[in-house]
């Protein structure tokens, strides 16, 4: 069974897409708002019936109902509002994530955890600490979304399908993240050879600012992109596809970084992160990567210690 904690826009989008992809036959929605997850589950069950899907949705306000889940997806947290940075969400969401982590440890101690709560990398650290799980089973979602956005904007410039691009985005899910055109390929040819310097600059800027742009346009943050990315990660875990994806994971010596969650390429399977892939970076790329790592370190250092137990 897959449990999704948080029945807002991202959680429900993920639930719908996972149902359409038939990733599991049982999907549980948990939320603190009475009636919300139950109503969403009922509506989704009607969808399943109409489409002939062998997927059943459940709604609950009780964490104990996640017992037996092998995958827990956490989308709960305060949303990012127009003009708000991810860092401003830090303390409030650290409290929420810490409390949820303890409940996951209690009721789903063998699960793989994927979370979307912002600021993402710092919240991945909070979840890792509060559950006490191995780093392989606590995964920050954002890299799939960032890589997908890079592929979209690069494809628009080149007039090709986004599916033909293998994108790499590293660092923090936030203002210091950086796409790596020299390591993003179309059939072995890097984007840095296919796009002009000006085009590359535009693609990178569009990728970094994509989330804020969506929020500016409609007044609330993205949900369909994150929902699709979560479904892709859930599929890798549930079906043990051993697929390479970009995800935020606590590094333990890779890239000469320790105890900091950072967006990097990983192999994802049934037990979570099976391998962290280390790609060769130029001196300039490594400098940007380490700047991103330091930005995450500063966020982690500002988290109250009582949320890290």
Swiss-Prot record:
Gene3D superfamilies attached to this UniProt entry: Lactate dehydrogenase/glycoside hydrolase, family 4, C-terminal, NAD(P)-binding Rossmann-like Domain
Enzyme Commission designation: 1.1.1.37
Keyword field: NAD, Oxidoreductase, Tricarboxylic acid cycle
Any one GO BP annotation for this protein: lactate metabolic process
Recorded superkingdom: Archaea
Known catalytic reactions: (S)-malate + NAD(+) = oxaloacetate + NADH + H(+)
GO terms assigned for molecular function: L-lactate dehydrogenase activity; L-malate dehydrogenase (NAD+) activity
Amino acids binding NAD(+): 6-11, 31, 93, 116-118
Active site: 173
Residues at which substrate binds: 80, 86, 118, 149
One protein family per Pfam: Ldh_1_C
Temperature dependence: Optimum temperature is above 92 degrees Celsius.
pH dependence: Optimum pH is 10.0.
Classification via InterPro entries: L-lactate/malate_DH, Lactate/malate_DH_C, Lactate/malate_DH_N, Lactate_DH/Glyco_Ohase_4_C, Malate_DH_type3, NAD(P)-bd_dom_sf
Family per similarity comment: Belongs to the LDH/MDH superfamily.
Function: Catalyzes the reversible oxidation of malate to oxaloacetate. Exhibits higher specific activity for oxaloacetate reduction than for malate oxidation in vitro. Has a strong preference for NAD. Can use NADPH for oxaloacetate reduction, but activity decreases more than 90%. No activity detected with NADP(+) and malate.
Assembly and binders: Homotetramer.
Name of the featured protein: Malate dehydrogenase
Gene name linked to the record: mdh
